[in-house]
Amino acid sequence: MEDAEVVLRRAPLFDGLDEESARALRRQMSDVKLSRGEHLFLEGQDGDRLYVVLDGKIKLTRAAADGRENLLTVLGPGEMFGELSLFDPRPRTSSASAVTDATVAALGHDALRPWLLERPEVSMHMLQALARRLRRANDVTADLVFTDVPGRVAKNLLDLAERFGEQDRDGLHVHHDLTQEELAQLVGASRETVNKALADFAARGWLQISARSVLILDIERLRRRAR
């Protein structure tokens, strides 16, 4: 497990702060430990704080009209979430729960607002993070319309590999910690269709499939399939 202070410095909230300011802001935060499957907040609840993942993985989900759960994203150490309610104080638009045992650092909006007023650069970094998230959401929407399921599977595996992959001489190990159903939700397709795509990739020698992880053997082929 990485040192919490090192992880926090990767978050947009701390980007650009000097050491003294970063320590002062850290003192305003409280740590929350979650067991696997435990909810941090639910869609529709009022939001009064943002969070940074210190350890483990957090997933953000949203309920569909028919009651099914849609997996929006999986977040790892250094990634921030829950900040939307700071700029738009309406109920939460998603639920957050632990994919693995996890620890997050929480910062209340009342403690954060003075920092944003005194340090416009912090506000700018947070807005840039929101812009990146919006751009990603637009890409996901476009993929659902224009990209076939195998292409979306490849693209999501590459995204997970970029954030959670560990390279060794065997290949790129991606411990995503997702069930088959969760991976299908992330892709936006049925579990059967996603499993068929994964089996095809494995048969071609591009990857090996394990429980809640994959070993990528030919990342270039996977990149071409994601285009």
Positions of PLM-derived features:
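Phosphate-/nucleic-acid-contacting segments
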Residues: 149, 156-227
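A generic structural signal for short hydrophobic patches within well-formed alpha-helices
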Residues: 22, 112-113, 222
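Short aromatic/basic micro-patch
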Residues: 16, 50, 74, 106, ...
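Amphipathic, well-packed alpha-helical segments that form the structural scaffold of globular domains
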Residues: 26, 30, 128-131, 135, ...
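Long cytosolic regulatory regions associated with cyclic-nucleotide signaling
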Residues: 1-6, 19-22, 84, 91, ...
